Amino acid sequence: MAGQQALLLFGFILPGLLFSEAAKILTVSLVGGSHFLLMHQISQILQDHGHNVTMLLQKGNLLLPGFKEEEKSYKVFNWFLPEDCNEEFKRSFHSFMEKTFGGRCKFEHFLNIMELLGHHCSHLLRRKDVMKSLKNENFDLVIVEMFDYCPFLVAEKLGKPFVAILPSALGTVDFGLPSPLSYVPVFYSLLTDQMDFWGRVKNFLMFFEFFKKQWKIQSAYDDTIKEHFPDDSRPVLSHLLTKAELWFVNTDFAFDFARPLLPNTVCIGGLMSKPVKPVPQEFENFITKFGDSGFVLVSLGSMVSFIRSQEVLKEMNAAFAHLPQGVIWKYNPSHWPKDIKLAPNVKIVHWLPQNDLLGHPRIRLFVSHGGMNSIMEAIQHGVPMVGIPLFGDQHENLLRVKAKKFGVSIQLKQIKAETLALKMKQVIEDKRYKSAAEAASIIRRSQPLTPAQRLVGWINHILQTGGAAHLKPHAFQQPWYEQYLLDVFLFLLVVTLGTMWLCGKLLGLVARWLCGARKLKKA
């Protein structure tokens, strides 16, 4: 078995070894937090495999407090957003987070964020010095991340082939995948792949709601496109999505629901996972105090360094106090309210080595916001979860965690000390959750190629072949009515109705002839 895997691996990476000439690759990172971390990892992996990688990095709004920038060997091309725009975005984002913690966040608030990102894109494309420098580099390939649409417009402006990274689960954006509505849940339908009749009715209706929201998000970039692209060559954002040579998706079927994929779609969930290192001594000393009871890791993501609702904070702190385990909580100590006494079994830290703590033998539970990178790391190490979704794709992610039976979730507005403590004890004490998490880990780990090998292998493949036209279906060139055979149905309907009309006419003629013949006979 090991020999077969080695042979498969060698056969897959051989073309990359033969492709000895290093390619010039541009990666575009315009959003912070986990989005930057994923693009950093992709850039570093490709650099380590012999390519010359440059990252276009928007400084000022992404290296969040507490993030320790790792050493990197790829080049960085920095650009700075005007300070007033940066401050406006920070105010809007803080307002968005306050509404999230207050349970008042709506799609319109997210749309406001996307509109600001559209304005930021205009500022970038307006920077002739930046765009000229990038054009002069003559990159072979651009790698863009699908959180907002600006990276796609940058690649289009440079006139270079591009590869897209989807940082979330499948289905969060439509880039042409077949999606049978009978078992592929629409994003934000909060359905699984096992739908009853009413579930399928809901999924069908949510399909139209999903496309309406996608259209609104894409419309936020209309002014940017009109300003920076001439009338005769203005890109349509939905068409740009299908123009990508490859789509790398930050998911894995150990987590996601099985569904059809296209040949140019590659799952790389787990790309952020790294070999486990010993945790720093301060963490080890804290963990040791709780012996075999172990510890619980709490992190609500790279974009949440503190909780803006004191009520939620009190309830979470009280819930942790009910546990016999120690609790290591990623929370900025300088923001801890003075009137709330920290539970004696809780350690709060501004930064923590999440991957190493998840790989620690004494970890018992991971309390997470449900971000994809965090979930993939938890699956890698077989750690069960309690999820507290905040916004974006996190509700859908944690629905999948629950469906796969290696965790549960609780809504932010439902958090009470007793309820949260009960959920955590349930997952820690019921060994079925741990078993399901370990089963998912085996599925993730036992695949023939690692996520990094898939990434590098497919990038090298399209560099060798000059693109991925051979991996894209002709459907991308067809109008929508051809894809759904509406012209065929219309033709068959016309033929059927025409035939019925003609048959009716003929029957009428025959009936009149027979009636006429009877009258003549009687006469």
Curated annotation (Swiss-Prot):
Catalyses: glucuronate acceptor + UDP-alpha-D-glucuronate = acceptor beta-D-glucuronoside + UDP + H(+)
Query: Which residues get glycosylated?
Result: N52
Cytoplasmic side of membrane: 505-523
List the Gene3D superfamilies hit by this protein, alphabetically.
Glycogen Phosphorylase B
PROSITE patterns per the record?
A: UDPGT
Q: Which GO terms describe its molecular function?
A: glucuronosyltransferase activity
Keyword Lipoprotein present in the record's keywords: the answer is: no
From which domain of life does this come? Eukaryota
Keyword terms, alphabetized: Glycoprotein, Glycosyltransferase, Membrane, Signal, Transferase, Transmembrane, Transmembrane helix
Localized where? Answer: Membrane
E.C. no = 2.4.1.17
Membrane topology of this protein: Single-pass type I membrane protein
- State where it is primarily located: membrane
Residues assigned to the Extracellular compartment are: 23-483
- UniProt keyword Thylakoid present: no
Name the GO cellular-component terms.
UDP-N-acetylglucosamine transferase complex
Signal peptide span: 1-22
Q: What are the transmembrane regions?
A: 484-504
Q: Which family does it belong to?
A: Belongs to the UDP-glycosyltransferase family.
Query: What does the UniProt function comment say about this protein?
Result: UDP-glucuronosyltransferases catalyze phase II biotransformation reactions in which lipophilic substrates are conjugated with glucuronic acid to increase water solubility and enhance excretion. They are of major importance in the conjugation and subsequent elimination of potentially toxic xenobiotics and endogenous compounds.
Spell out the PANTHER family in the cross-references: EG:EG0003.4 PROTEIN-RELATED (PTHR48043), UDP-GLUCURONOSYLTRANSFERASE 3A2 (PTHR48043:SF24)
> What is the name attached to this protein's record?
UDP-glucuronosyltransferase 3A1
